[in-house]
Amino acid sequence: MDRNAAERRIAELRAEIRRHDHLYYVLDRPELTDAEYDALYRELLKLEEEHPELVTPDSPSRRVGGAPLEKFKQVTHRIPMLSLENAFTDGDIAEFDARVKRALALPAGEEIAYVCEPKLDGLAVELVYEYGTLTVGSTRGDGVVGENVTQNLKTVKSIPLRLEGENPPELLEVRGEVFLPLAAFQRLNAQREEEGEPPFANPRNAAAGSLRQLDSRITARRPLTMFCYAPGEIRGADFGSQGEFLSALRQRGLPVTSLARQVTGVAGVLAYYREMTEKRDTLPYEIDGVVVKVDSFPLQRELGEKSRSPRWAVAVKFPPRQAVTVIEDIVPSVGRTGVITPTANLRPVEVSGVTVSRATLHNWEEMERKDIRIGDTVVIERAGDVIPAVVKVLTEKRSGSERFLPIPAACPECGSEVVKIPDEVAVRCMGLSCPAQIRESIIHFASRNAMDMEGLGEKYIEQLLRLGLVGNVADLYTLTRDDFMKFDRMGEKLAENLLNAIEASKKRELSRFIFALGIRHVGEHTAKLLATAFGSIDNLARATEAELLSIREIGPQVAQSITTFFHNEGNRETIRRMVEAGVEPTVEEKKVGGKFTGKTFVFTGTLIRFSRSEAQKMVESEGGHAAGSVSKKTDYVVAGDEAGSKLDKARQLGVTVLAEDEFLQMLEGEQ
């Protein structure tokens, strides 16, 4: 390919990859399979390698991270990034509203239009776009001077390296919050504990630690994301309000929360605050309050700023999700990789409406650092679905009877040697036949998100182990009706159901089978990538590290873990036995020419005949796409009982709304 043809093709590939990055990471509406995306990305890398003079700073290939820096350079913000004044009560909100009205000399009875947004618990940053290209990214710092973290921010997939649309502004400074979703935070901490590294205390610390890496390649491996919420300096564009500004950011491809809303007066703010309080635990990321801003930019300018905070905005904080209780005992437990984790048994206490009786202590180094002892009075914190953690010891409450739990000399489950690996914080059982590791690996294999052996839970698996009927996961496929009838209080019907569940698991999707194997560092998402890329367990078992590294989102650590797993003779024998028993994982392919091909569905509310995930699979099996949010490109919204904001948005956008029965008629070909 000559240079001119290469230049044209590179431009096409970059535009296409940017479009699909935006669809995947911002809109949650992927149109390509991972394999199709990877093919585009590899073609771009190959062409840029052949024509290095055509590489540009805004190319998607620049997201991978570069050589480590010695230190971050400083960046002075053109307009200071101010902090917000806090409010905690209904009275505080009313007082803020009254101050705004007094400052604007509004007549009695006139209400202010506010924009309310969730207050994200992450790291504040500023993005600078010059003529549409991201040139500088920096942290807030002290509000006047921050750190230049441009290379790291370029690895965040939801941040466009180039703005969408024609005629971008000469200068657009955008402020926002970089954060780590809760599910990603849990995966990251689980991975760190397996690797013997100290876990992050909370998602905010994880986001800050990830973004402030001197080696941007480490940042690139962390699934950070961002929501934009405020302007800095702007030249070449003009906005009249916060609502108009957020709308313009969306049109330019920048990530903006879908929960921002214009409200009127104190009543509107309070209603929004209560709504977010209720939604807080259902969100996939951590929020710690609500930000309230005067919507009108002219009114914001009239109100002005104090030395450290604007007069036109306030942060309404949620009550803390903490409680004080007593550690009644500390119990070591063994995971499926042999890591021994201390867990605190607590005097039951209610935190944010949930009764908490256990808290993770992570590892012995963390216990020593916090000086946590049995009998201590402690402060615990619960965040979303994250396991509660001890955040502080109230040493002033000690009586002298408290005692520290030392690292066990032997595995509490099998008595094998316990080793603390150098440069790791993890303590591991070295027993190859440790019953706790075997138990946890079988529980994981049979679990709902893995092989989904319905009914075969922890209680029955422990009985199988106690009776010596299973020694690893392959033994599950050798069980008979007579084996189950040896259980306490086991009926023939239940035994038959368990055998049917095991039999049904033989045809599970390949991605589930890969996840079920318990390969270190391979979660559900990575398992799906591997299933798409290799198509069979045999192909994956033969894959080289180089082949694995060619897959988007697979790094050296994961690749090495996968090859190590399949090079192990015992693991290969286990898989061979399962295949001989009839385990035949399937690869789901979208139906070509299905009745929903090219159509996007969104499900909201409670469905009667099936779960939402089952309905989404039905759509995908007919060639359609099941999205998580409503947009102008949504074709149908299927509304069940108690449908919420998605139904309202569908009506606003004129999207066709279907009842559950109407969706079934379409599925069965009656419409």
From Swiss-Prot:
Alphabetical list of Gene3D superfamilies matching this protein? 5' to 3' exonuclease, C-terminal subdomain, 6.20.10.30, BRCT domain, DNA ligase/mRNA capping enzyme, Helix hairpin bin, Nucleic acid-binding proteins
Active-site residues are K119 (n6-amp-lysine intermediate)
Show the catalytic activity: NAD(+) + (deoxyribonucleotide)n-3'-hydroxyl + 5'-phospho-(deoxyribonucleotide)m = (deoxyribonucleotide)n+m + AMP + beta-nicotinamide D-nucleotide
Q: Which Pfam families match?
A: BRCT, DNA_ligase_aden, DNA_ligase_OB, DNA_ligase_ZBD, HHH_2, HHH_5, Nlig-Ia
Q: Which InterPro entries match?
A: BRCT_dom, BRCT_dom_sf, DisA/LigA_HHH, DNA_ligase, DNA_ligase_AS, DNA_ligase_CS, DNAligase_adenylation, DNAligase_N
Q: Name one GO molecular function term.
A: metal ion binding
Q: Which residues bind NAD(+)?
A: D34, A35, E36, Y37, D38, S83, L84, E117, R140, E177, K293, K317
GO annotations under biological process? Answer: DNA repair; DNA replication
Q: Give the SUPFAM superfamilies listed for this entry.
A: BRCT domain, DNA ligase/mRNA capping enzyme, catalytic domain, Nucleic acid-binding proteins, RuvA domain 2-like
Under Enzyme Commission nomenclature, its number is 6.5.1.2
The BRCT domain, residue ranges: 591-671
Q: Name one GO cellular component term.
A: cytosol
This one is known as: DNA ligase
Please report the organism this UniProt entry assigns to the protein. Geobacter metallireducens (strain ATCC 53774 / DSM 7210 / GS-15)
Report the gene name.
ligA
